[in-house]
Curated annotation (Swiss-Prot):
GO terms for cellular component: nucleolus; preribosome. Residues 68-91 have a biased composition (Acidic residues). This is Nucleolar protein 12. GO terms for biological process: maturation of LSU-rRNA from tricistronic rRNA transcript (SSU-rRNA, 5.8S rRNA, LSU-rRNA). Belongs to the RRM RBM34 family. It comes from Candida albicans (strain SC5314 / ATCC MYA-2876) (Yeast). SMART domains: RRM. Residues 160-258, 266-351 form the RRM domain. Residues 24-37, 124-141, 439-455 have a biased composition (Basic and acidic residues). Involved in pre-25S rRNA processing. Residues 51-66, 349-363 have a biased composition (Polar residues). Residues 1-104, 117-142, 333-402, 420-455 are annotated as: Disordered. Residues 339-348, 425-438 have a biased composition (Basic residues). InterPro entries: Nucleotide-bd_a/b_plait_sf, RBD_domain_sf, RRM_dom. The gene is NOP12.
Length: 455
């Protein structure tokens, strides 16, 4: 026994350790009184008043929650009555901000749903009313009558028009020269109108004001003219006046809608010209060197300044003249007895070199763009040919509007002189119009009469 007792130690030491565990009163047994003193934690659930627009299901759920809250309150009151008298008074717990905000969450949610439904219904009503009003307006409004602008009048006018280049500028300033110029072309038929273009002025003024003042630029002694005949055969016959001399100027005459064919085999390119070079000097120079074989001379000019770009195209009557003209390359231009410092650069004329197809300014790309805009319209073959003719013959203003839709304007009967018009005074026949009295003359007469009476 002694050996086993030595293994586990003395019993007195074990008892001492157990006594140390239960020395503290807090570690001892808990009495019932202490348990009763501790209050039970209860969460108060506020009563929620249901809105009037809630459904029956929502009302039932709210009633159940209210009954459950009432039962919990009754249990809490029973337990509080069983406690001490000092703890009978209910301790009010402080309410947090979140509880105040979340009191009516459910009611707010249903109110929001109902308001959204009402807004959707109002929007649908407004959209339906707007659609119905638009349909009614479309029915009441009459569609505007439109037609495709084919420029038929301008094309018919172009068939009777002749272009005249290198016209002396004195035609604008002198009435005698203008009359002689008109008589020259009047020999082939009656003239409807004459328009002068490519006029360069000396001052930077509006063109109408500058034309009225007739302050022309001194370095530019020629203009272009468009002569409109009353009949087409007369305009075609007037092409015979090409290369005729009028006031020491060789005229370049060509038809607008039926121009003369361009032959590159009979044409030369002349470069390194002065910007203020005149067409008449080239006429005289090449006629003197090539036995009067020049058919036409054209200096390419800037559309805004009317100054030359430094090169020209000269067309001859015979192809042999081209070979002779090439011998004049790198030789100065002679004007009478004087020689200019610039040496001419003469070469054979080539076909129009087209720019890159990637460029939007390429003629084919512009043509495709124009065709794409017109493809939306349903045009027949006759209309397409007219649009193509207008694009090739008419000017910039007409080319920009050809093929577009235009409104049809209905006009009534035009008024004539002496016709009676309702609502306008003094429109009856035979009634003279009263002239206004001259006040100065009458006042002078009265003053003279007064002086006569005084005397």
């Amino acid at each position: 026994m002694s050996s086993f007792a030595n293994l586990f130690g003395k019993s007195t030491k074990v008892d001492e350790n157990i006594e140390q565990l239960f020395k503290n009163t807090r570690d001892g047994p808990v009495s019932k009184d202490e348990l009763v003193k501790k209050q039970r934690t209860v969460i108060k659930i506020p009563k929620v008043t249901a809105p009037k627009q809630q459904t029956n299901e929502n009302e039932s759920t709210l009633n159940q929650s209210a009954n459950e809250s009432d039962e919990e309150e009754e249990e809490y009151n029973d337990e509080s009555n069983e406690g001490d008298d000092s703890d009978d008074a209910e301790q009010t717990e402080p309410t947090s901000k979140n509880d105040d905000e979340n009191e009516n969450l459910e009611a707010q949610y249903f109110d929001k749903l109902l308001s959204e439904q009402n807004e959707e219904q109002d929007e649908s009503k407004e959209s339906s009313e707007a659609k119905s009003s638009k349909v009614a307006e479309e029915r009441t409004k009459a569609k505007v009558a439109t037609t495709v602008d084919l420029k038929e009048k301008e094309l018919e006018k172009a068939d009777r028009t002749v272009f005249v280049g290198n016209v002396p500028a004195d035609v604008i300033t002198s009435k005698i020269i203008a009359k002689n110029f008109k008589n020259l072309f009047k020999h082939y038929g009656k003239i409807d109108s004459i328009r002068y273009r490519s006029i360069s002025f000396d001052e930077h003024l509006p063109r109408k004001v500058a034309f009225a003042k007739k302050n022309l630029h001194k370095s530019r002694d020629s203009v272009n003219a468009y002569i409109v005949y009353k009949e087409k055969p007369a305009s075609i016959a007037a092409k015979e006046l090409n290369a005729t001399v009028f006031e020491d100027h060789h005229l370049r005459v060509d038809h607008v809608s039926h121009p003369a064919p361009k032959d590159n085999k009979r044409t030369i390119f002349v470069g390194n010209l002065d910007f203020e070079e005149k067409e008449e000097t080239l006429w005289k120079y090449f006629n003197s060197k090539l036995d009067q074989d020049v058919e036409s001379v054209r200096i390419i000019r800037d559309s805004k300044t009317n100054l030359g770009k430094g090169f020209a195209l000269v067309q001859f009557k015979d192809t042999l003249s081209v070979n002779k003209a090439l011998l004049l390359n790198d030789k100065p231009l002679e004007t009478g007895t004087q020689k200019k410092g610039r040496k001419l650069r003469i070469s054979r004329a080539k076909s129009n070199a087209k720019p890159s197809l990637m460029s939007p300014n390429h003629f084919d790309n512009q043509k495709k763009k124009f065709a794409a805009g017109k493809s939306q319209q349903k045009l027949n073959d006759n209309q397409k040919t007219k649009i193509g003719r207008a694009q090739s013959t008419l000017g910039k203003a007409d080319r920009s509007t050809v093929g577009k839709a235009k409104r049809i304007i209905l006009e009534g009967q035009r008024a004539t002189k002496g016709e009676a018009i309702k609502g306008i005074k003094g429109s009856k026949k035979g009634k003279k119009v009263k002239k206004p009295r001259i006040r100065e003359r009458s006042t002078k007469f009265k003053e003279e009469r007064k002086t006569m009476n005084k005397v």
